[in-house]
Every structure is written in C-alpha cells, then in structure tokens.
Amino acid sequence: MSFPATSPSLSSYNQLQSLDIPDAARRYRRFSNVSDAVSRKLSTTLGWRTVSIQEVVTQAKSLCGQHIRAWLKRRGLFTRKLGLQRLRSVASLPGGLAVCDVFVQLEGLSLELERKHPKLYSGVCRQMGVAVVTEKTIAKNLSSMAHNIFKKDITWFKVASFYNLVSAAAVDCVRQGHPEYLYGLVEAAGLVIERDVANWIANQGGWVSEQEGQNQ
C-alpha cells in the first residue's frame, strides 16, 4: 500500500476550504443528522443496532489521542505536560472496554503498516511540504491527504494508516517544540473521520467491528 507523500490540490477539498467555518459545520451536522435518521429507521425496521455518527466521531477522537500517546511513548517523547490528559479515557466512552479492545487491534494494524512503510510515516510535515509548522497548516494538509486516501474506498488498513499519519505529525510537532498543537491534531482527525469515514464505520456496526474486519 502506498500513498502520495505530497498533499495535492484537490478540487473538492478546495471547495470545502472556500466555505466559512460555520457554513461547513452546519453542512456536516446536516449530513450527520440525515445519516442518523436513516440509521434509526433501518434499525427499527430490520433490527440492526444503531450506531450514531456522533458516537463514532467521539470514539475516533479518543482513539486518536491514545494512538498519539502510544507513538510518543515509543519514541521517548511523552510527558504529562503535553496536554493529552484533556481527552477522556477510552474506557469512559460509549462502548467501554470493547473500544479498549479496538485500540489494541488498531495498534496492531498501525505497527504492521509502520514496519512495512517506515519512510511513509517519518518526517510527515516535510513530506507534506509544510515549510512553517503551524496547527492550521498541518491540519489542512492532513485533511487533504485523508481525502486522497479515502476517496476511492475505505478499509480498516486505510483508517490505521491515517492514524499513523496524524501520530507522525504529532511527533514532528513535539520535536519542533509545539506540543500545544496535539489537541488540535486530535480535533482535526475527528473532523476528517466525520467527513470521510464515520458513515462507513457506522454502517459496519461501529468501531467494535474493526476487530472482525481487520483483515480487509
């Protein structure tokens, strides 16, 4: 699996960039509300378990925080001063211990990808062409790369790869003296999941289905 090292200019993403933030947020909420309504109707009719988009996104952000924490610890960069304690524990979120199990599976996929493609997840800011590291520029480039990753199809390996990119960017931020950007990266990852992946995850049955679909 190989993804572009640079962040291309994508017309659909540029259109999103042209929207002001409140307008974009309203559109995201409207799409999410419609999706939730359809899911509830199908659940009532067919007996499917309803997994809300908000539940998926909330858990995605917590998983992202845990993922970043694990990457920093493996590189000897994690301290309590980094601010990740602001994130709620995975165990306290809807899904509880099951989501903790999801994190173990997610880490397994992430480590496998990192072993196979070490250069892809090293110096991510440089690969994205970010000359001046700011929270906004990193979030913008991650969003563009994510759009390119998920535009054709979505798999759990691609989700794990996106998390690797976010965590690699977090490593770059800490090494360049900007640990205060980490929480913003988690928020940016949450927006990407909501925009590109949340509906797919919900249709799979939520994050817990990752344990069954990790070989996709």
Segments the model singles out, each with a brief description of its role:
Residues 143-216:
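Alpha-helical bundle/repeat cores within regulatory domains of eukaryotic proteins
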Residues 106-172:
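Amphipathic alpha-helical interface segments within eukaryotic helical scaffold
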Residues 1-131, 199-216:
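Terminal intrinsically disordered, low-complexity, charge-rich regions
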